[in-house]
Amino acid sequence: MNRVYNDHHIPVLLNEVVENLIWKPDGVYVDCTVGEGGHTRAIAERVLPYGGRVIGIDVDSEVLQIAEHNLLSYPNVQLFKFSYVELPVLLSLLQVHKVDGLLVDLGVSTYQLKAEGRGFSFNQDEPLDMRMNLENNLTAYHIVNTYPEEKLADIIYNYGEENFSRRIARAIVQNRPIQTTRQLVEVIKRALPYKEVHNRKRHFATKTFQAIRIEVNKEIENISKFLEFAPDYLNSGGRLAIISFHSLEDRIVKHVFKNDKRLKPIGDFISPTTFEVAENPRARSAKLRLAERV
């Protein structure tokens, strides 16, 4: 697959992440979801003069190649193909016991949305895939074409917060096999009432696609697992920063930050400015939450 080395993607809440995550300029920081390297580069730039270093990980081998290209000029960055739920394994291999900051951006990267054949976007006609880790077996095609109707409906309702989940699940089952993203969009369109198709602020397929993507990549399970162990890998005073894009993730993060005795929340969540949303519309639903290791 051809990869476009895009040096102009826009990281979400970039300044807010850098200003709040970096408290020790000579420290060790981990970007747990490197993507195309925007946050990683900004962190590396800030800590480089002080001898600070950045460990970057991502589960997507294709997007990691783009990050490698974009970060060539930063000698204080090391990149690895790992999932953030595998962080303890990587830190053990690197003989790093604790770090000073952890960042997780739970959004989909620009590359993943636009790259041919990945199946993340409803704006293109592609095979139903949606895997962030291309080595995983579970795809959107498998979910759409094999899951029982009730299970599909629950996923669309719980992960997509879609009120018409039962109607959509029934339509999916009735129209199997569904091969491509465009076919799935048409099925969703026919399942929804007219006003839901034409009057929603976002595209009518957004919630269903989000739900399927979350199921494919086990996103809720992964962030829950990560939050269980992450505080143990932070030095005292270390920062944990999580960017979420929908209320289900944010509720989990908020609950842990409030109730985990190892952590102290830093203020309330941070939202993008009106200017940032105008420049980068996909930032509109982002929330940054921060906590400090006690």
UniProtKB/Swiss-Prot annotation:
Annotated EC: 2.1.1.199
Catalytic activity: cytidine(1402) in 16S rRNA + S-adenosyl-L-methionine = N(4)-methylcytidine(1402) in 16S rRNA + S-adenosyl-L-homocysteine + H(+)
Keywords, in A-Z order: Cytoplasm, Methyltransferase, rRNA processing, S-adenosyl-L-methionine, Transferase
Gene Ontology biological process terms from the UniProt entry: rRNA base methylation
Main location group: cytoplasm
Positions with a binding annotation for S-adenosyl-L-methionine: G37, G38, H39, D58, L93, D105, Q112
Gene Ontology molecular function: rRNA (cytosine-N4-)-methyltransferase activity
Record keyword Methyltransferase present: yes
GO cellular component: cytoplasm
Location of the protein in the cell: Cytoplasm
Entry-linked InterPro entries: RsmH, SAM-dep_MeTrfase_MraW_recog, SAM-dependent_MTases_sf
Family annotation (Pfam families): Methyltransf_5
NCBIfam families assigned: 16S rRNA (cytosine(1402)-N(4))-methyltransferase RsmH
Function: Specifically methylates the N4 position of cytidine in position 1402 (C1402) of 16S rRNA.
HAMAP family given in the database record: 16SrRNA_methyltr_H
Family statement: Belongs to the methyltransferase superfamily. RsmH family.
PANTHER family according to UniProt: 12S RRNA N4-METHYLCYTIDINE METHYLTRANSFERASE, S-ADENOSYL-METHYLTRANSFERASE MRAW
UniProt-recorded name of the protein: Ribosomal RNA small subunit methyltransferase H
Organism the protein comes from: Fervidobacterium nodosum (strain ATCC 35602 / DSM 5306 / Rt17-B1)
